[in-house]
Structures are given as C-alpha cells and as structure tokens.
C-alpha cells in the first residue's frame, strides 16, 4: 500500500512539473494587443478550443430564485463545463478567449480567470469547480503556451474519447501527454495555433 502511494505521488509530481513554464514570449500571439487570442485547430476552418456546458441535476431540482442567486454569484459548479474543441456553431459551445499579462506576455488567465487543472492519471485538462476537488488533480501554469507550442515543450496535445463527460456532451476532451508517453488508441493528436478574434469574425 505504502509503495503504491509513493508511486502515485511521483506520477503526480512528474505530471505537475511539466506545466511550470517561465520566461515565455508572445511572438506567436496575433491578437489586437499582446495576449488576446483564440486557439484554433490547425487544418480546420472554424474549430476552436472552448467549452461546452450543461446544467447539473442540483440546479434543476431547486427553485428559480435559488438558481438565479447562484447564477448571479457565478458559482462555477452550477453549470459544469467541459474543456473541448468544436466548431463555432456547435450547440452549447463557446470558444475561449485567452489572455496574457501585458508586461511579460505570459499566460494570465483563460476567459473568466478560472484556474485550469490536469488529471495526473488521465492527463485530461479541466478548469471547472470540480477540477480543484477532484482526485489526482494538479494545477497547471503556462497552459496556453504549451497548447500552442507542444513540440517545443515536449508535450503532445490530443483530443480523446471515450469518457463520461465526452459522451455526455458529445465532445472530445483535451489531453496533454509527455512526448515519451504512448498515446491511447482513443486519442488523436492535434495542433493548435493562436488567431486574432477579429480576424475570425468575433467581436
């Protein structure tokens, strides 16, 4: 039992370390100013990194007043979200606007500044309220730069199915693997590139 705990600890540690990036430049960011961009899947016309959402059972079983109050408080758990890729006109899908710190151009936040996490066992990326309390979760820093420059930072970016959340929302998850890891058969490698929201028709 003790050996298993040590093994799991080192797996989690190794996974967490690869997300600690510093001194990153924004030479590939082509937003209106340094650090406002969308991540587009290379080789597609309108497929972006974004989120799909659904209303949880607890929200459906409470009164309208309680639901509205939780919505005003922007409670993340009220409407769980899946970090995924999809075409812009997909139902319940919203492309995410990534931002960076203007002075250094290092990644600062994703959309509404929620902190992304990675599952150290499945390598699935998530940033909803459940990710923080989920077992095997590890905080990510420098996520957007790794997604854009995966080969430079020795990681593989992939979309994966099946999975409970992927089946529920009919969308793949986004996972990050070390280059030396074998990718599961249910995953497909993808390449992402930053694009200016205005150039893509977003206001």
UniProtKB/Swiss-Prot annotation:
Keyword Signal: yes
Keyword Zinc annotated: yes
Signal sequence annotation: 1-16
Protein induction: By zinc depletion.
Compartments where found: Cytoplasm, Cytosol
Matches recorded under Pfam families: Vel1p (PF10339)
Keywords: Cytoplasm, Signal, Zinc
GO terms under cellular component: cytosol
Family: Belongs to the VEL1 family.
Identification of the protein by name: VEL1-related protein SPBPB2B2.15
Native organism: Schizosaccharomyces pombe (strain 972 / ATCC 24843) (Fission yeast)
């Amino acid at each position: 039992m003790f050996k298993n705990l040590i093994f799991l600890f080192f797996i989690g540690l190794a996974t967490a370390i690869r997300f600690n990036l510093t001194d990153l430049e924004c030479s590939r960011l082509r937003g209106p100013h340094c650090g406002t961009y969308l991540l587009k899947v290379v080789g597609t016309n309108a497929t972006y990194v974004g989120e799909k959402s659904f209303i949880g059972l607890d929200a459906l079983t409470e009164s309208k007043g309680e639901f509205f109050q939780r919505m005003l408080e922007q409670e993340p758990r009220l409407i769980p979200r899946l970090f995924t890729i999809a075409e812009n006109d997909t139902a319940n899908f919203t492309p995410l606007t990534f931002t960076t710190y203007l002075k250094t151009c290092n990644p600062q936040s994703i959309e509404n500044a929620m902190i992304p996490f990675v599952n150290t066992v499945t390598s699935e990326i998530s940033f909803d309220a459940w990710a923080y309390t989920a077992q095997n979760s590890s905080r990510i820093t420098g996520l957007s730069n790794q997604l854009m420059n995966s080969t430079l930072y020795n990681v593989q970016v992939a979309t994966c199915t099946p999975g409970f959340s992927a089946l529920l929302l009919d969308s793949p998850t986004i996972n990050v693997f070390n280059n030396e890891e074998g990718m599961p058969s249910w995953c497909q490698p993808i390449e992402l590139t930053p694009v200016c929201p205005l150039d893509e028709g977003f206001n």
